[in-house]
Amino acid sequence: MLTLASKLKRDDGVKGSRTSSTTSDSTRRVSVRDRLLVKEVAELEANLPCTCKVNFPDPNKLHYFHLTVSPDESYYQGGRFQFEIEVPDAYNMVPPKVKCLTRIWHPNITETGEICLSLLREHSIDGTGWAPTRTLKDVVWGLNSLFTDLLNFDDPLNIEAAEHHLRDKDEYRNKVEDYIKRYAR
């Protein structure tokens, strides 16, 4: 099977054996994004949290993949939460687009899948938003942390979930467990 990594390796070998006058239109340049992704995906796979798995539906499209987070602690323990990650052409100047595909009761993720994670913000006033120095590894570790140390009830996207937690923590836990049983198995 031809993957983007093997294609890049093959193209580099072909490029090295050609002179500029023999380069044809059939040998297309690989985008900066795709070159970065080859390195970043290798780094990500070597440093993946034990609670996460990545899946590339098409191994030739490293710019589109799924992440499964299976927290082993917190309110969300026992759930399997799917995220869709799409890396735009302008990467690494802009962050990846991320959506939660699993319905969840969470203060930082809406029931429709929008996510509040500062490093996914293109423009941030506090300096914690996206920067070209960030990588896919940062994104995956950040998403994983939304279920533990980055779980933030004080700056919610899903205000109803945060207020629910403030009102009655036991009831909140019950609703989270119900959502896990119904949507995250």
From Swiss-Prot:
Positions of region (Disordered): 1-29
Molecular-function annotations in GO: ATP binding; NEDD8 conjugating enzyme activity; NEDD8 ligase activity
The keyword ATP-binding belongs to this UniProt entry's keyword annotation: yes
Keywords associated with the record: ATP-binding, Nucleotide-binding, Transferase, Ubl conjugation pathway
Catalytic activity annotation: [E1 NEDD8-activating enzyme]-S-[NEDD8 protein]-yl-L-cysteine + [E2 NEDD8-conjugating enzyme]-L-cysteine = [E1 NEDD8-activating enzyme]-L-cysteine + [E2 NEDD8-conjugating enzyme]-S-[NEDD8-protein]-yl-L-cysteine
Ranges of residues in domain UBC core: 32-185
EC numbers, comma separated: 2.3.2.34
InterPro entries: UBQ-conjugat_E2_core, UBQ-conjugating_AS, UBQ-conjugating_enzyme/RWD
Example of a GO biological process term: protein neddylation
Pfam family name, one: UQ_con
Pathway noted in the entry: Protein modification; protein neddylation
Segments for region (Interaction with uba3): 1-29
Role this protein plays: Accepts the ubiquitin-like protein NEDD8 from the UBA3-NAE1 E1 complex and catalyzes its covalent attachment to other proteins. Together with the E3 ubiquitin ligase rnf7/rbx2, specifically neddylates cullin-5 (cul5). Does not neddylate cul1, cul2, cul3, cul4a or cul4b.
Family (UniProt): Belongs to the ubiquitin-conjugating enzyme family. UBE2F subfamily.
Name the record gives this protein: NEDD8-conjugating enzyme UBE2F
Gene: ube2f
